[in-house]
Amino acid sequence: MSNKGQLLQDPFLNALRKEHVPVSIYLVNGIKLQGNIESFDQYVVLLRNTVTQMVYKHAISTVVPARPVNFHPDAEASS
């Protein structure tokens, strides 16, 4: 994964995690998962609902927050 991708993903996912924002995660096969982001790294997201699920990023299509979230990507990410 490129560094530029991480410059956008990390601040967004971290804001969702820190603010405990509920999210809907849609997978590439159409399945919808819901919960709170507990943690993440370069390859996976830990999603907590009644249990914690490890979701591989390559299987994720879309992450939809339940409410707007403020995050500050590096200026380089917007170029």
Curated annotation (Swiss-Prot):
Domain Sm: 10-69
Keyword Cell inner membrane in record: no
Pfam families on file: Hfq
Quaternary structure annotation from Swiss-Prot or TrEMBL: Homohexamer.
CDD domains according to UniProt: Hfq
DNA repair listed as a keyword: no
Function per UniProt: RNA chaperone that binds small regulatory RNA (sRNAs) and mRNAs to facilitate mRNA translational regulation in response to envelope stress, environmental stress and changes in metabolite concentrations. Also binds with high specificity to tRNAs.
Source organism: Burkholderia multivorans (strain ATCC 17616 / 249)
Name of the protein this chain belongs to: RNA-binding protein Hfq
GO cellular component, one term: cytosol
Protein family: Belongs to the Hfq family.
UniProt GO BP: regulation of DNA-templated transcription; regulation of RNA stability; regulation of translation, ncRNA-mediated
Keywords (A to Z) from UniProt: RNA-binding, Stress response
Gene Ontology molecular function: RNA binding
UniProt cross-references to InterPro entries, sorted A to Z: Hfq (IPR005001), LSM_dom_sf (IPR010920), Sm (IPR047575)
